[in-house]
Amino acid sequence: MKILILGGKGMAGHMITSYFKQKQDYNVFYTSKDINDKDGIYLDVTDSIKLEKIIDSIKPDVTINCIGILNENANNNPKLAFQINSLLPHQLVKLIERTNGKLIHISTDCVFLGTKGNYTENDIPDGTSIYARSKQLGEIVSDKHLTIRTSIIGPELKENGIGLFLWFISQQGTVKGYEKVYWNGVTTLELAKAIDMMIRNKVSGLYHLCSEKKISKNNLLRLIQSIFDKKDVEIVPNSEIFLDRSLTNTRTDFIYKVPPYDEMLIELKEWLDMQ
């Protein structure tokens, strides 16, 4: 089976690429913005003609879209955010369907405002930021394709990455541990494993990939600190901010059992130690 991963050097994309390359039944291709990457296919995703040529040439059975303009970058560049977060997934569907391919699109819990938590697939996205609105518009809900809503933590190749894991690992001294900011996402390794299972089980539509139990960012940081032996940081509990974008999965046709947080983080550490 031919797999094309768009954004193969990003936080989600590089882990998914590494994981799928270790599976013998997948022939893996990935795109990158790094012109010196000899293994990847160079792509500026705003170049629609090049994108079309790549898809027409490879004819992937499954295309995994890991490209996104995130958070502040989206708010500072609204035109680019809507082009990539909103329009690109719909453009991909049209290109991929020419050869009966399938799109797996990665969305985010940030489509929700975070005022109540436990959001289901049937809840109407109410996020108001440029990032939230652009991601809402890009979600593909179709019986042919799959949109995975989730929130991820994991290593990054870019030193200027903005994810929680990289941020925390690079800190020294004291950091705030938010006791009322709740999360129930997955590691990037767990996301890769879940996508593998979803491909094999032909899952489509909208899927919330989440843990059954939510965890505060304070406790999450403490878990990371313990498992990754991060001794040069003191986590100071802080209850000033309330935010709960936790997801709930109501699908019964396919159930992916997300492991406990400590198990996911231990497995991630073991994976990284082997690389």
Regions found by a protein language model. Give the residues of each.
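N-terminal Rossmann NAD(P)H-binding glycine-rich loop of SDR-like oxidoreductase domains
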Residues: I3-K23
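Rossmann-fold cofactor-recognition segment
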Residues: K33-I49
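NAD(P)H-binding glycine-rich loop region in Rossmannoid oxidoreductase-like domains
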Residues: V45-I84
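NAD(P)-cofactor binding segment of oxidoreductase domains
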Residues: D61, N76-I104
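Catalytic helix-loop patch of NAD(P)-dependent Rossmann-fold dehydrogenases
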Residues: Q83, L87-Q91, C110-I148, I152-L157
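NAD(P)-dependent short-chain dehydrogenase/reductase
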Residues: T128, I140-G185, L189-E190, D196
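Mid/C-terminal beta-alpha module of Rossmann-like enzyme folds, strongest
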Residues: A194-D244
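Conserved C-terminal active-site "lid" loop/helix of NAD(P)H-dependent oxidoreductases
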Residues: S216-R222, I235-Q275
